[in-house]
Amino acid sequence: MEFPGSSDNYLTITGPGHPFLTGTETFHTPSLGDEEFEIPPISLDSDPSLAVSDVVGHFDDLADSSGVQDEGFAAQYGVQTLDMPVEMAHEVMDQTGGLLGAGLAMDLDHPIVTPYSANPPVTIDVSMTDMSSGILGHGQLTTIDQSELSSQLGLSLGGGTILHPVQSPDDHLSPTPSPTSSLHDEDMEDFRRITAPKSIIVEQTKKPKTPKKKKKKDPNEPQKPLSAYALFFRDTQAAIKGQNPNATFGEVSKIVASMWDSLGEEQKQVYKRKTEAAKKEYLKALALYKANQLSQVAVDTVDLDPPAVPALLSESPVPSPTVVTATSIPECVSSPSVSSSPSQTVAAPQQSIAKIIISKQILPAGQGSTAIAMSQGMVTVIPATVVTSRGLPLAQLQPSPQAQRITRSVLQAAMQMPPRLQPPPLQQMQQPPRLLQMAPAQQPSITILQAPPPLQPMQKVRLSLQPPPLQIKIIPPPLQPQPQVVQVQNQSLSVINVPASPEAPASPPEQLEVLPEVVQEESPPPQMDVELVSSSPPPSLSPQCVRSGCENPPVECKDWDNEYCSNECVVKHCRDTFMSWIATRSQGTLAPVK
């Protein structure tokens, strides 16, 4: 196949050696402007009755003498049977005559180059260059119909089937326009529709990015302390700004950096000590803040309606039962009194409770049934802050006229008892059922004057199994760090079978005294050795003014962090620091800037 360059676009079929077809006799391929041609394949039968001269007679009116002569094939050969499906697709011409796209596909069942024999193949030359100069110049545009061509050639199409090229429904083009008339309007519309550039718009659905929400900084969170250099910078920048009001922040930073490098080691130690003290205070405040956050999270995540765990409680003659006092319950428990019966089922909601174990020997001997009930029972004490935050109706809870006060020895005995002597969390569930027996007339209440020790994981699990129903009255604590006064009116006391430890110190019964009235508030005895953790930081040891030579205590001022006694000391300190820096600068001992 050859594509010789010429000024005309033609399709030349030269049968070598045939006198009726020369190189000057050509027939033009129809040019219809911007359109797409799809020529179906034509199967030629080697019928001896085929007269090729009919083809020449049919195309005499289309002959053009401007064709390129091809004299490369001069021998006489016959026509060989060929199956040549030829497809020309997307011949798109613009107004300037430039070829935008052209394609030629030929499928030959027999190769063109074959060994020479009596019947060599016919050579087909297709020239597709410079299509505008030769074809677009004609005023009369004609098309060749496939059926017309087959009728003129007298081809028998039964043996050789015409393979139509596969066309999409959108790009369908009728292959049989009129051979002697110009294009109709609908054909032009089809051509425009086919040759029009198709743009496929693919909408990409992108998920909108959700902006990340920045965590709001808790105003109660303690602020990080400043470094020694930051403290020095804060103290000296005011003096530098006073002398150089037009100085930029970068210039001030360079000056302060050089001043800090030239500062004496003793003066640097002053700032470093302040930073260390501030860091210690920050760590303490941060620990308290995190503890409060954890306690709030624990309160918020408590299951309000947990499944009930039935348990049969009974009084067993053990040598030393215990009274358990809790310090931290996520929410208040207020349930009706449990009637005294040989067997009673108590629903136990899951709660996080700490406990204090008190041996039986510390209870007074005179309070026989009360002592047994209290020793066999579990008394739960709820802090005032938790109950008041949950909205406990205090008016509905009335205390009993009889109250027992747990004094220092009771708390010390409970705190000194080692945790390893406590039964594991699942021990209660493995014990046999027991009956609850208690006197319904006696409803003692316990007033605790001191905060019990912190929680332990084993204590939380243990008391979450079988807490007793209680009615509780809480007196909110004052703002100052004072012991919480919690009054508990016991409705029903659960039995806990815990053997007493021989290592636990037993206090004499005289340590307990019965009060005729409920203790509202009372300061702890001076000999109490119980540490209270309060939110207020410990007082610093004799703070003094930062300015050297001034021994006055600092005055509270938010601008200077309570470090100076007056504004005069602030100015003097900054001036002294600045003057010392100027003196070192004049001596030529200026240190490099950071």
Swiss-Prot record:
Biological process (GO), any one: positive regulation of transcription elongation by RNA polymerase II
InterPro entries xrefs: HMG_box_dom (IPR009071), HMG_box_dom_sf (IPR036910), TOX_HMG-box_domain (IPR051365)
Record key words, sorted: Chromosome, DNA-binding, Nucleus, Phosphoprotein
One example GO MF annotation: chromatin DNA binding
Domain of life: Eukaryota
Gene Ontology CC terms, in alphabetical order: nucleus; PTW/PP1 phosphatase complex
SMART domains to which the protein is assigned, alphabetical: HMG
Function description: Transcription factor that modulates cell fate reprogramming from the somatic state to the pluripotent and neuronal fate. Also acts as a regulatory component of protein phosphatase 1 (PP1) complexes. Component of the PNUTS-PP1 protein phosphatase complex, a PP1 complex that regulates RNA polymerase II transcription pause-release. PNUTS-PP1 also plays a role in the control of chromatin structure and cell cycle progression during the transition from mitosis into interphase.
Listed name of the protein: TOX high mobility group box family member 4-B
Organism, scientific name: Xenopus laevis
